[in-house]
């Protein structure tokens, strides 16, 4: 519900009027797509934008910009918590230096991508460079209908920049959407805390938060759908390292993943047929290479 509320706030900033009741199933399909595509938890974002654009008649560049803004707002608290986690694990866990370096590099990469995205949104010259770079790729790999596709690129990037500027400059981002993002991450950690309480274990929320953030970083690596297996293993390993028994760590992790991963996936997959076979095509495209995905997204 909170994910849906945040996206609704962003949509309203862009003049897209849609109720939470209508947005909620789209969000669930997006979450399910994130879980089944090895795209660093980003495979569901184009699907969300596509469904909203198709069903409500808004331009794709506008709906995609609201989805990107929503993802960026989710990234801000994650980066903040990731920095605190890297500092904290030096006290709670004895990790090899290369693991710490890898986590630091991952956070720096996320921050760099976020800065580039925002900079492209507010700087027309940089946006033009991105435009020209994409056009260069089109001319190199796509010979047929390249002029038409180039025009689509111009339209999408211009519309994306206009929408992002509008969203970024709106004070409701700071007053409502950003605080809501922190609340969402707090509830994510509290969910794990409640799972441990259900087993009669009182685990420090700090340890839970650190393990959860580390597992989330692993889950963003686009190797397995939703970080399947890797996230579970990391959570069990680090809970055990923190002094929690292996059996309790495994049981709590399985229950938590049933709630956060499998429940969301099943609900999203049950809702998916409602939106038709074209959405399945989008999900298939999300699993392909970045170049192919970008091309189909523009179409």
Segments (PLM) and residue ranges:
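Hydrophobic/aromatic residues in alpha-helical transmembrane segments
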Residues: 2-10, 48, 188-195, 213-214, ...
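Membrane-embedded helical hairpins/re-entrant loop segments and their flanking transmembrane helices
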Residues: 3-29, 195-211
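Membrane-helix interface segments
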Residues: 16-25, 58-60, 95-98, 172-173, ...
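Hydrophobic alpha-helical transmembrane segments
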Residues: 20-25, 100-107, 174-179, 205-210, ...
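Alpha-helical transmembrane segments of multi-pass membrane proteins
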Residues: 21-30, 62, 206-217, 247-258
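Transmembrane helix-loop-helix hairpins in multi-pass inner-membrane proteins
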Residues: 33-144, 224, 228-299
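Short, membrane-interfacial amphipathic segments enriched in basic
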Residues: 57, 139-160
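Transmembrane helical segments that form the transport core of multi-pass membrane transport proteins
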Residues: 158-161, 165-214
């Amino acid at each position: 519900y909170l994910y849906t509320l945040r996206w609704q706030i962003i949509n309203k900033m862009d003049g897209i009027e849609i109720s939470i009741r209508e947005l909620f199933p789209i969000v669930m399909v997006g979450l399910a797509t994130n879980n089944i595509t090895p795209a660093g938890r980003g495979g569901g974002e184009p699907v969300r934008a596509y469904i909203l654009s198709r069903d409500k008649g808004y331009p794709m560049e506008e709906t995609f910009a609201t989805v990107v803004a929503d993802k960026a707002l989710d990234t801000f608290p994650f980066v903040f918590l990731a920095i605190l986690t890297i500092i904290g694990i030096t006290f709670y866990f004895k990790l090899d230096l290369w693991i710490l370096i890898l986590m630091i590099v991952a956070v720096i990469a996320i921050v760099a991508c976020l800065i580039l995205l925002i900079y492209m949104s507010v700087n027309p010259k940089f946006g033009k460079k991105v435009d020209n770079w994409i056009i260069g790729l089109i001319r190199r790999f796509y010979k047929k209908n390249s002029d038409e596709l180039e025009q689509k690129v111009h339209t999408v990037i211009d519309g994306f920049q206009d929408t992002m500027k509008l969203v970024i400059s709106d004070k409701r981002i700071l007053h409502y959407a950003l605080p809501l993002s922190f609340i969402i991450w707090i509830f994510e950690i509290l969910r794990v805390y409640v799972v441990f309480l259900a087993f009669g274990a009182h685990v420090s929320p700090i340890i839970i938060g650190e393990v959860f953030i580390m597992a989330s970083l692993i889950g963003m690596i686009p190797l397995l759908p939703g970080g399947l297996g890797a996230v579970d293993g990391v959570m069990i390993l680090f809970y055990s390292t923190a002094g929690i028994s292996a059996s309790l760590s495994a049981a709590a992790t399985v229950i938590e993943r049933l709630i956060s991963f499998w429940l969301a996936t099943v609900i999203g997959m049950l809702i998916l047929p409602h939106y038709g076979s074209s959405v399945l095509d989008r999900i298939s495209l999300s699993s392909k290479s970045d170049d192919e995905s970008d091309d189909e997204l523009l179409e």
